[in-house]
């Protein structure tokens, strides 16, 4: 009898914890009644928040945030409740706060239903290997990444000087996957088509799984999705295949570590194992690699595509920056170091201005409150609230950036020359440049992203002629979804080898 009662108690407690973590209702408007709400004046539907949230954010910034007042707005995913936009005065309290108070992983779980989809998760180990090992070794990786960009273009394009017409985003995503995979998993897999396909598909699989599960199961019954829904099954299959592809590479890295040959390989897989004394399992390594792919792949390729579009419609900038690249190439004799990359200051400034005008997201520092919190000035947020800061609106504030709607490719070069030579570079973060987040939780891979984009652009612009296909001189229109923006997925480019090369 005692065993039965004990078992029943354990099951009951377990069910309550499951309910608390997965079925607990989202925070209500009533709990946020002290925060003003902003809505669309007409057609205030969830779809409108998916398609037109930028205009509402700008309205909210001018009406509330600029004056230090937070506001709430509808979340396009109704079950998540209202979301809060905070003014910048709260950023310092948030950006250094512990994840036990304000959590991005919890936000990701609630939005993408990671508990049900078998998707790879963020881990401290993965963030550490990028922040420390990868960043520290970028100089050693630079030339290999440059050569990989050359190889990737040679594989994709005809050797003749005929024009190749290609879908810009898909082409650049595949090239980015190959170049970045060299640093993530090493030379054995960076040219493996199946690994590249997994790299490209994982992010979309996560989005699709969340959408499918949310549409098929109410919160109370989502635990069934792991066994019934095809979406988690597809994710499991991708993870299993990733493990199979990584297995021989994993064994090679493990053998090198056991022989104390710590310099044998320069990639994140090796550094992850070395940091744990070779005791990290293959399954866990695969989890880390898939997460790093999700974190870096489409953000890097989207930014690269946006920068290229901005260059191609501004031939005066394109010519000057290509000349700067050629001078750097001559000086380094085709063997890149970080010092030589850093000399391309016009390119760096142009990339940062492109990111300011055409970001991949309108907001930054997305978090969910793990427990109730009262800020220093008395603002209270209950547990379970999604909140964020208005990056895009800050980047278009004329009090911060004069003539913010004008694309000034050398805006940040001028600031480096007149204000501070050590600030305003592409990978830097500040309270007025939020493209990579803020504080201790800023994107740990931003220096890697910067290097990859620059080296790919060097190969594209110095060895090839590139132009937009069917272009009337205007930039291909961006796509919008919720708080996200990205370069056109339909736009095509024309590319051919420069004569004499």
From Swiss-Prot:
Pathway: Mycotoxin biosynthesis. It comes from the Eukaryota. Heme binds at residue 443. Keywords: Glycoprotein, Heme, Iron, Metal-binding, Monooxygenase, Oxidoreductase, Signal. Its cofactor is heme. PROSITE patterns: CYTOCHROME_P450. Residues 1-28 form the signal peptide. One of its GO terms (molecular function) is monooxygenase activity. Pfam families: p450 (PF00067). Glycans are attached at residues 115, 154. The keyword Transcription regulation does not apply. One of its GO terms (biological process) is biosynthetic process. The keyword Metal-binding applies. Cytochrome P450 monooxygenase; part of the gene cluster that mediates the biosynthesis of a family of the mycotoxins cytochalasins E and K. The hybrid PKS-NRPS synthetase ccsA and the enoyl reductase ccsC are responsible for fusion of phenylalanine with an octaketide backbone and subsequent release of the stable tetramic acid precursor. The polyketide synthase module (PKS) of the PKS-NRPS ccsA is responsible for the synthesis of the octaketide backbone. The downstream nonribosomal peptide synthetase (NRPS) amidates the carboxyl end of the octaketide with a phenylalanine. Belongs to the cytochrome P450 family. This is Cytochrome P450 monooxygenase ccsG. The gene is ccsG.
């Amino acid at each position: 009898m005692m065993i039965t009662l004990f078992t029943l108690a354990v099951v009951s407690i377990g069910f309550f914890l499951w309910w608390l973590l997965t079925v607990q209702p989202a925070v209500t408007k009533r709990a946020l009644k002290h925060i003003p709400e902003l809505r669309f004046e007409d057609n205030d539907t969830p779809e409108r928040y998916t398609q037109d949230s930028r205009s509402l954010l700008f309205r909210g910034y001018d009406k509330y945030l600029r004056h230090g007042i937070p506001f709430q707005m509808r979340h396009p995913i109704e079950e998540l409740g209202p979301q809060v936009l905070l003014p910048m005065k709260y950023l310092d309290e948030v950006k250094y706060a512990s994840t036990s108070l304000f959590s991005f992983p919890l936000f990701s779980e609630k939005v993408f239903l990671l508990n049900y989809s078998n998707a790879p998760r963020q881990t401290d180990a993965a963030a550490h290997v990028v922040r420390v090992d990868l960043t520290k070794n970028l100089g050693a990786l630079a030339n290999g990444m440059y050569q990989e960009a050359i190889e990737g273009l040679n594989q994709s394009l005809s050797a003749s000087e005929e024009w190749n017409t290609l879908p810009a985003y898909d082409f650049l995503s595949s090239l980015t996957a190959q170049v970045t995979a060299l640093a993530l998993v090493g030379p054995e897999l960076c040219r493996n088509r199946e690994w590249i396909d997994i790299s490209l598909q994982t992010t979309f699989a996560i989005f699709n799984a969340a959408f499918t599960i949310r549409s098929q199961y109410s919160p109370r019954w989502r635990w069934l999705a792991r066994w019934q829904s095809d979406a988690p099954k597809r994710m499991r299959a991708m993870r299993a295949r990733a493990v199979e592809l990584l297995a021989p590479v994993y064994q090679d890295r493990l053998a090198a570590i056991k022989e104390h040959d710590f310099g044998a390989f320069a990639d994140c897989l090796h550094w992850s194992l070395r940091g744990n004394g070779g005791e990290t399992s293959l399954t866990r390594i695969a989890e880390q690699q898939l997460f790093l792919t999700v974190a870096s792949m489409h953000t890097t390729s989207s930014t690269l595509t946006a920068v290229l579009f901005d260059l191609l419609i501004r031939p005066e900038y394109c010519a000057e920056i290509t000349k700067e690249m050629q001078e750097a190439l001559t000086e380094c004799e085709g063997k890149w170091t970080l010092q030589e990359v850093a000399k391309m200051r016009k390119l760096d400034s142009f990339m940062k201005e492109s990111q300011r005008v055409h970001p991949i997201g309108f907001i930054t520092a997305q978090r969910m409150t793990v427990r109730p919190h009262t800020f220093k000035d008395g603002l209270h947020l209950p547990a379970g609230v999604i909140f964020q800061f208005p990056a895009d609106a800050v980047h278009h504030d004329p009090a911060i950036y004069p003539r913010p709607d004008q694309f000034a490719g050398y805006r940040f070069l001028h600031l480096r020359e007149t204000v501070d030579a050590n600030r305003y570079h592409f990978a830097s973060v500040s309270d007025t440049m939020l493209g990579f987040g803020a504080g201790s939780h800023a994107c740990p891979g931003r220096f890697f992203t910067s290097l990859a984009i620059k080296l790919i652009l060097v190969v594209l612009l110095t060895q090839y002629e590139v132009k937009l296909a069917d272009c009337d001189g205007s930039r291909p229109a961006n796509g919008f979804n919720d708080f996200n923006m990205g370069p056109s997925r339909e736009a095509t480019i024309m590319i051919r080898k420069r004569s004499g090369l």
